[in-house]
Amino acid sequence: MARHPARCLLLLVAALSLQLTGCSDDSPQASGKRTNTPPTTGSAASGPAASEAARSAPFSLREYDGPIDPGPHRLPLISWERSYPVDALVHVPPGFITPGGWVIDNGRNGPAYGDLMVYGDVDLVDTDPCGAGRNVKPGSTVRDLAQSLVDQVPHWATTPEPITVGGHRGLYVELRVPSNLSRCESGEFTVFAVDQVENPWYSAGPGSVLRFWIVDVDGQRVAVAVKVVPGRTTHTAELVHMAETARFVENSGG
């Protein structure tokens, strides 16, 4: 009789063990679910995952190609193998895409093209964007670059105006591209070049308006460039607003 309680106790322990094992198999850890862990971030090829929108850190468009989720995003200074101490931080509204590093109006109509790009260096300026001009070095300061654009013939640029972007002072210059580029050697209006690489020129098609906000960010000259075609680019106001409200943050390297 004394052995029966022990046997009952063993049976009770075994039953409890089986019950606990069953509960463990249904747990998130056992099934591979991680309820308290955000989903894996999307790769550069696939773009930001849904979790990116919920994170406080803006997503970098450095390597991403595709539609841009509305919200704050980092734009690298266009470099072609150069590195810079800062990124531009812009708040992108709906309706834009990126090929990796800058913002493009997502219009389906080719002539409606518009974009926003951020440059860290301008190595050469074409003295005659539509003819056989010389390529000159613009110097290293904000005023040097602005004046080089103004000096282009036949004087396409407006007089530089003082501006502030992201708390940094600079100059604003606007260029209006002729509607007829038939006399242009390349058929395009070539403004300036970045580095000595294949297709380094920043250029525009007929009738474009080019806007430049050139600022000094703690010793780094930055040119925020917006290209639109008046009456055709779908989101001109949004592109300009992104440029005017840009901020500059430390380069995160990604």
What label would you give each PLM region?
Residues 144-213:
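Signature of long, low-cysteine stretches enriched in small and polar/charged residues
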Residues 2-133, 204-209, 215-254:
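N-terminal targeting sequences that direct proteins away from the cytosol to non-cytosolic compartments
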